[in-house]
Amino acid sequence: MEMSELLASEVVSSGPDYAKKSVDGLNMTAANGTNDTLMTLDEYLNKSLPLHLEQLILDANQKELFDSAAKSLLSSTLLAKQQQSLQIAPIQPQSSFSSQSFAEGLIVGQLSVIVALIFVIKFFVFSEGGTKTATAKSVGSASSFMDSTKNSILSTIIKRGGKDGLEVDDKDNEKSRQINSILEKTYYNVETHSPESLDWFNVLIAQTIHQFREEALQKNNILNSLNDFIERRSNELPQYLDQIKITEVDIGDDFPIFSNCIIQYSPNSNKKRLEAKIDIDLSDRLALGIETKLLLNYPKPFSAALPIKLTVSIVRFQACLTVSLTTDEQFVPTSEETNDDEMGNDKGYYLMFSFNPEYRMELEVKSLIGARSKLENIPKIASLIEYQISKWFVERCVEPRFQFVKLPSMWPRSKNTRKEKTDTDDSVSVKSND
């Protein structure tokens, strides 16, 4: 680039000098010509003048060529310099940007590694008992996620009737299909099946009640539980009542009779739940007798006491019993004292039972008030006690309210395994005791 600049400058500088030298040469030749030989004007015009003019024109053309070449060289040099400046300018910020981004990425990477190491050391190496409660929710959510994934995997392994036990999205329709399948496979038609007598069920219930009565007589379970209940509620008794004592407990000698059992769809369930309607009839005497004193505080506290004896007996009970298997998700508790651990957290099936509002309960209330002059079987007291018992029963066991009983697991377990004791086992146990 520097050589081209020097050549252009030399051409520009030498152009005028060269033309001047050519004119001076012509003058000198003309002068010399006058000294040596004299030329005529015609010869000069015909011979010498054209040569001189041609030389002048050539010199002028050369000068123009030199000027154009110099200008083109200068313009080319300027364009080359501009292009070099444009190419160099964006390269410098790009290199600076790349170096800056590399430094930032390196710093961010190192910081992320340090934070990860601190997290691991804090929560996995130096974790204490207090942090366990703080992370209980996260652990619970993780365990629930693991359980769900485990159940989804096991559902592909467990089969039902040769089919995969996969979960069904439409659970409502699946329940109705399951009920229809049960009725079909057990050959039970809800619409046309006749009521059953349940004689075999009466025998089983009678054996269970008999065993319950034997234990109550031998171990005084009912009496002990009633005394404990009275002691726990003694602080809630009003001040005008003395201590309550149990005088009689009659557990009866007869058994309930179940009959006319039919299976039907539960109302308001859209054929998604079955229930059993069973007539129950009990003719027996179930009695509870207590005695206490009514403390009179006039004219001064504890100046007089009025003895009271009450005996309440159930002599007849007739009703229609409704029994169904369900889950606790389908109903809501009516009491605020319901424990969340008893219902809601324990998944499983419950035995639901209730009685029809058209039930019959016959009560006998015997009352005796006074020490010397006694008032016996006062109707007002009998009606008041009957009303309170009926109210208690309706609020707990009469439709639309139900009672739930959690069903235990029916899977065989080793701790529940037993075998019948024989005479040899008795003799061996006696010898070991001796």
Curated annotation (Swiss-Prot):
Cellular component aspect of the GO annotation: endoplasmic reticulum membrane; ERMES complex
What is the membrane topology noted in the UniProt record heading this document?
Single-pass type I membrane protein
In this protein, which residues make up the domain named SMP-LTD? 194-408
Keywords for this protein: Endoplasmic reticulum, Lipid transport, Lipid-binding, Membrane, Transmembrane, Transmembrane helix, Transport
Question: Topology: which residues are Lumenal?
Answer: 1-105
Q: Kindly report the protein's main subcellular placement as a broad class.
A: endoplasmic reticulum
| Cell compartments where the protein resides | Endoplasmic reticulum membrane
> One Pfam family name from the record?
MMM1
Q: Name one GO biological process term.
A: mitochondrial genome maintenance
Segments on the Cytoplasmic face: 127-434
Positions of region (Disordered): 415-434
User: What InterPro entries would the database entry show?
Assistant: Mmm1, MMM1_dom, SMP_LBD
The Gene Ontology terms for molecular function here are: lipid binding
Q: Which residues form a coiled coil?
A: none
Bilayer-spanning residue ranges: 106-126
Q: Which HAMAP family match?
A: Mmm1
Under the subunit heading, UniProt states:
Homodimer. Component of the ER-mitochondria encounter structure (ERMES) or MDM complex, composed of MMM1, MDM10, MDM12 and MDM34. A MMM1 homodimer associates with one molecule of MDM12 on each side in a pairwise head-to-tail manner, and the SMP-LTD domains of MMM1 and MDM12 generate a continuous hydrophobic tunnel for phospholipid trafficking.
User: What does the comment on domains in this protein's record state?
Assistant: The SMP-LTD domain is a barrel-like domain that can bind various types of glycerophospholipids in its interior and mediate their transfer between two adjacent bilayers.
Regarding protein family, the annotation reads:
Belongs to the MMM1 family.
General function of this protein: Component of the ERMES/MDM complex, which serves as a molecular tether to connect the endoplasmic reticulum (ER) and mitochondria. Components of this complex are involved in the control of mitochondrial shape and protein biogenesis, and function in nonvesicular lipid trafficking between the ER and mitochondria. The MDM12-MMM1 subcomplex functions in the major beta-barrel assembly pathway that is responsible for biogenesis of all outer membrane beta-barrel proteins, and acts in a late step after the SAM complex.
Please state what the protein is called.
Maintenance of mitochondrial morphology protein 1
